[in-house]
Amino acid sequence: RSKKNQIIFTSKKVNSDDKVINLIDNFLEEKNSFIFESVEKGKIKGRYTIFGKNPDKIWEFNNQKSYLITENKKIILKDKPEELIEKIIENFKFDTPKNLPKICSLISGYFSYDAIRYIENIPNKCKNDLNLPDVRLMRPRTVIIHDNLKKEIYFIINIFNDEKISNYQKKFEDIKSELFKLSIQSLIKNLDNKTYKEFNNINIKSNTPKN
């Protein structure tokens, strides 16, 4: 019942890349999911592959306005974008277990080039043809990390200090169930992808004669 941010996790060894491929196929089908590679210094492949999904909060900043998306509702906030971003980062502090990578808890998203206008007086003459916010940040509850060096996968659930929990025992049981389901995702091949492969093997003939 601590007011601190908490990390609950489990892990397992992997002998091949098949489990990671299964995670890519199954995990990334969900909305607001992502994958990162920790590539450094020009290497082709980094040590960690990081998956994230299930954000409880998403912040969007556009035209000097701040928005919060939570529980399928979009709320306009009074905070200035630059001030709110500082608050988000300041409140995002975790005591990371020694056997977990530091990136086990993270805020993910992007800052567009237009975000420079929040701190610099630059004319806004560009056409917004993509209709995307200047900044979009989210804090994923669910994170999976594949350690390519140790050949180990970490399944992680983040519990944030502002989350309202009425029944702690039920919450803990729900988390255990969620961690189990995540581990199963690494074992199951995506059926849709299997279907696509089967279609690729079909012998297709043209019904248009060649001249």
Map each language-model feature to its residues.
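Short, charge-rich binding segments
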Residues: I50-F51, D95-K102, R136
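Short HxH-centered metal-ligating active-site micro-motif
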Residues: E83-D95, P101-L106
